[in-house]
Regions:
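Short, small-residue-biased leader/transition segments that mark boundaries at the very start
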Residues: 1-3
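Short N-terminal edge-element motif at the start of the domain
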Residues: 8-48
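C-terminal tail/extension regions appended to the core domain(s) of diverse proteins
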Residues: 5, 9, 18, 154, ...
Length: 165
């Protein structure tokens, strides 16, 4: 059986409901040469009796079997990562250029994003011993991948608008 015919497993603890089994064809710069073969939204593997959570799963295949390195995240965390991504992209597009090192060393907090009656702090990780170099590399990667990211952001914006957000 060729890999493109391989289906995401349904007999494991994560129970797929919605799948993208051809994700390997669109996995950014790794398209067609990735071990990430699919994505799914389904019932979380950690569900307790009477409590059902939705999770997103990244399915990786080693060539012989589905990898234990496949990642599963609760759906709200996927959205929180999208929020963190969007706020970070906005920061690097509109604010980071103002600072010689790409961030304000005295005030590394970028934003406080309101969620659930509290807020998620978005900040440059100044605990990282190589943060100046890593910010530079991060900015270069954002620049290099601008077209890939932009395509996904436009699609996300379009879908959110279509959904009434």
């Amino acid at each position: 059986m060729c890999i493109r015919d391989r289906k995401i497993p349904t007999a494991l603890r994560h129970k797929p409901v919605i799948v993208a089994e051809d994700y390997e064809h669109v996995d950014g710069r790794n398209a067609y040469q990735t071990d990430t073969k699919g994505l799914s939204l389904g019932l979380a593997q950690w569900n307790d009796r009477g409590k059902v959570d939705i999770s997103a799963k990244v399915w990786r295949y080693t060539g012989e079997k589905w990898s234990r390195q496949s990642e599963e995240l609760p759906l709200h965390r996927v959205l929180d990562l999208a929020i963190l991504t969007c706020r970070s992209l906005l920061y690097f597009r509109e604010e980071a250029y103002r600072y010689p090192k790409g961030y304000d060393e005295a005030h590394p907090v970028i934003d406080r994003v309101g969620l659930q009656g509290d807020a998620m702090t978005v900040a440059v990780c100044t605990e990282n011993d190589h943060i100046s170099e890593d910010v530079r590399l991060f900015r270069e990667a954002l620049s290099r991948d601008g077209e890939l990211l932009g395509e996904r952001m436009r699609l996300l914006a379009s879908l959110l608008k279509e959904m009434g957000y």
